[in-house]
Amino acid sequence: MNAILKGFSFVVYGVEKAVAHICSLLFSIMIVSVFSEIVLRSLFRASLIWSSELATYCFMWLTFLGSAIGVLRMTHLTADLLYKWVPEGHIVGKILEWFQLVLIAILGWVFVKYGIVFVEKGMSRMSYALGIPTGYNMMLIVVTGVLYMLNAVYLLIVKLIGWENGHD
């Protein structure tokens, strides 16, 4: 593995670590928001109008960011039926992996391209409870798209180099 690939690997796994920390923070915020809503409703028969919307936004970001981590860790959904027909280590299996990563990178590009449109349109609409432009929440599509592309390209490079050198 040359210096450029080591640097790319450092960036990719650094971003993954940062995203994992952000997910932990979002999960904590979501739990506190839901818990405070439950306590206020149960004890005081009062409600925080913004808590469920905040929890929903946190959940959406968690889902999308978590899926990007899943791409890097290769834990995303695959067509297992195709892999069951191919012997382990066979060239067809490697081609299927590459094809899958190319599709994920393309999906990331689609997320970025059309996510920007959603963000622009969302900046003119305000969320009901939080009173912020919904475009901020729609940014999760663009961020996830960039992460999909980054992780898929990294894995493609690693798999291509690993295969050429005789190891995976």
Which residue ranges define each predicted feature?
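Alpha-helical transmembrane segments and membrane-interface helix-loop junctions
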Residues: 1-168
